[in-house]
Amino acid sequence: MENIKVAKVGNVKFVNKGNELNGTLHLTAYHSIFSISENGKEIWTAYSMINNVKLCSNEKSFCIRIQCRDFMFFCWRFQSTEDAMDVYDTLQELMSINSINMLYAFYYMPSGDEEKLPSSWKSFLLENEYRRMGVGDSTQADGAGGNWRITKINENYSECHSYPQALAVPASISDSVIYYGCKYRSKNRFPTLTYLHKNSFSITRASQPLVGIRQNRSAQDEKLVEAIFATSIIPGKENLIVDARPSTNAMANIAVGAGSENMDHYRFAKKIYLGIDNIHVMRDSLNKIVNALKNTDISAAPPLIELLNRSSWLKHLANILQGAVLIVKTVHFRHAHVLVHCSDGWDRTSQLCALPQLCLDPYYRTIEGFFALVEKDWLSFGHRFAERCCHLPGKRIFTIDSSYSEEPPQSSPSSTLQYTFSTVRSALSGFSIDHSEKMMSPVFHQFLDCVWQIMDQFPNCFEFNERFLRRLLYHLYSCQYGSFLYNSERERAQASVSTHTRCIWDYFLSRKDEFKNPNYVPYDDVIMPDPSSLRWWSASFAQPDENMNIPSPSESPSL
């Protein structure tokens, strides 16, 4: 704090949705605190939640506009340009963190019930989750669980840095086959079990094969996939390899030494491309939502619907859910196995593995089960949270605009065009692009939105409520807990995260009653969402439902 210019500024106006509050602004090491003069209440903002800071000035106004990752957009208005500049410079100083171990999680000290609660870090063990599914259990009715085993080939993360140490593979496959076969998959992410359904058919996951222009093949990889599909067999049933990408993208990867399976060598299955776009398209989609909402600090007007629709956000969710439904049908109704991959197997693959399990297994629709699902398919299997969430944005989120106008654009074709060009020019987009941000993408955000869509269609089938999902989305970015820091289980272990930080599940377990669905009725059967009936999860964008879900006499404008 010794290098900051100011820690407290009086006579500041806090503006949100056009409403003004008078008060005093305090800047601490990890939060801004706005103390309201009228009632003494405080508005806290974690610096990790801030995604854009814009210093704006003209002859009449000096303000800082803030965009937060939870879509809380607000403005501080100051009495003088000196106050505005001092706060702007101080925020830059406080937020210019260049190491993950300097984030709030490493300094956060819980209080109350959370402090008394035993740490949740060791409450989830992947081996226990495999055993819950029946892996290694030959006493099941059909004995199929005994066709799987837990291997320690990745102990100390020796073969695949982004996989967990414990993995489930067919019992008929030796570690030697896996050792040689894993080199045929991108980042050594070889096919391995993520879910064994009660009918003994499986969902496995991997990364793309390294086919390349020479059409390389691997006898070990082919043997492993064949063994996976042979763990439970019903004659005449066709197993499925799901490539989440558009086929053109998969083919383009051949030029860089990767690609997709040559099905001449995997004759025991068929392959389907889902056409789900990559992280860059998804980032652009969220950018467009930010653009539609970005004036909600100075204006109470609803967002520009045409810009919301232009984002294609709900179309992307529909594509993901269509893939999830296909996997559910294949495993549960068609009694066949599914192998899922995209490029590296940690983005679209995680979505397409976790969402079907939510539909197939009622355990994952409980609070405890959802913890296990996130731990397994997102944290253990190496979703790159640090990259995708850009937890260390640095000074690139700070911009200055000396041509600031407090009049938001009107919703007309000409003003919309002007608005779009203005957005690009001013870099007010929620995710402006530089080198560090090319890997940023709302993949886990999309997953939570898809979960909400399923909850919206099956409101009584989930033990947790909508607020649970919103708080999980908030803490994805808050950096208050260590769970979502770093890019893999291995990196978190190397940083001793479980020793130096609190687990995200501590937050929810210490407040469990707040997140329970009062209408929950346990339902043991499979649920099947309708991907064509999606709505905007308006609360996640800090909007009332009527601002985003506008009825249409014909078809939904959202799709």
Swiss-Prot record:
One GO process term, biological-process aspect: intracellular signal transduction
Subcellular location(s) per record: Cytoplasm
Similarity field: Belongs to the protein-tyrosine phosphatase family. Non-receptor class myotubularin subfamily.
Sequence ranges assigned to domain Myotubularin phosphatase in this UniProt record: 120-541
Active site, per annotation: C342
Segments traversing the membrane: none
Organism: Schizosaccharomyces pombe (strain 972 / ATCC 24843)
Keyword GTP-binding appears in the UniProt entry: no
Protein task: Lipid phosphatase which dephosphorylates phosphatidylinositol 3-monophosphate (PI3P). Involved in the control of PI3P-dependent signaling and in the maintenance of endosomal system integrity.
GO molecular function: phosphatidylinositol-3-phosphate phosphatase activity
UniProt-recorded name of the protein: Phosphoinositide 3-phosphatase
Domain of life assignment: Eukaryota
Gene3D superfamilies: Pleckstrin-homology domain (PH domain)/Phosphotyrosine-binding domain (PTB)
Documented EC number(s): 3.1.3.64
InterPro entries the record matches: Myotubularin, Myotubularin-like_Pase_dom, PH-like_dom_sf, Prot-tyrosine_phosphatase-like, Tyr_Pase_AS, Tyr_Pase_cat
Reaction it catalyzes: a 1,2-diacyl-sn-glycero-3-phospho-(1D-myo-inositol-3-phosphate) + H2O = a 1,2-diacyl-sn-glycero-3-phospho-(1D-myo-inositol) + phosphate
Gene Ontology cellular component list: cytoplasm; cytosol; membrane
Keywords: Cytoplasm, Hydrolase
Organism phylogeny: Eukaryota, Fungi, Dikarya, Ascomycota, Taphrinomycotina
